[in-house]
């Protein structure tokens, strides 16, 4: 009888772990490929803008060249996440932090790729957490800074959860953002410009920690059951 009660309790805890996740989050993850180089026409127009949903990915591909291309003809960048003012002025020095560094233009394994997951919560103390309905901004500076004022910048809008369709199944869909529908740079009236600051443990909201705690309780109860 005790075993039946324990198994029932374990089932209830497991059910809560599964269904206490954000109901608006997507199951299918879209991946958006961005080729970060000055020859990309979207950067040349200055209106590079993509819309994503929570749990989507941004894949940034760095410039890459054949070995025959001399070093002084290659492009190298440091990419920063900045606030709206930094994006508008293309200035990372006031409110911004380094995200990635494209510093291997002759990488033997192909172009460097960096990925950003637009997640509500991160297990890393210096990770970045994203919120639906807000905008986020990326810019780059050239390495070395030789006086060129060309500014490569990207605006990302995280769509509200009610506009992200929930689907069944787990798979990745990959998009080159050039194939996506053109998006207006005009934000919605309720759009919030997010500050470019990584989240820290004490500042993170506590709601998503509940599934982790429940999972810990589940494992503890399972261990107790096995000792009976």
Curated annotation (Swiss-Prot):
Residues in Ephrin RBD domain copies: 29-162
Pfam family, one: Ephrin
A single MF term (Gene Ontology): chemorepellent activity
Membrane topology field: Lipid-anchor; GPI-anchor
Keyword Methyltransferase: no
Residues carrying sugar: 37
One example of a Gene Ontology biological process annotation: regulation of focal adhesion assembly
Subcellular location: Cell membrane; Membrane, Caveola
Biased amino acid composition, Basic and acidic residues: 190-200
Tissue specificity annotation: Expressed in brain, heart, placenta and lung.
Chain residue ranges for the region called Disordered: 186-205
Name by which UniProt lists this protein: Ephrin-A5
Native source species: Rattus norvegicus
Lineage summary: Eukaryota, Metazoa, Chordata, Craniata, Vertebrata
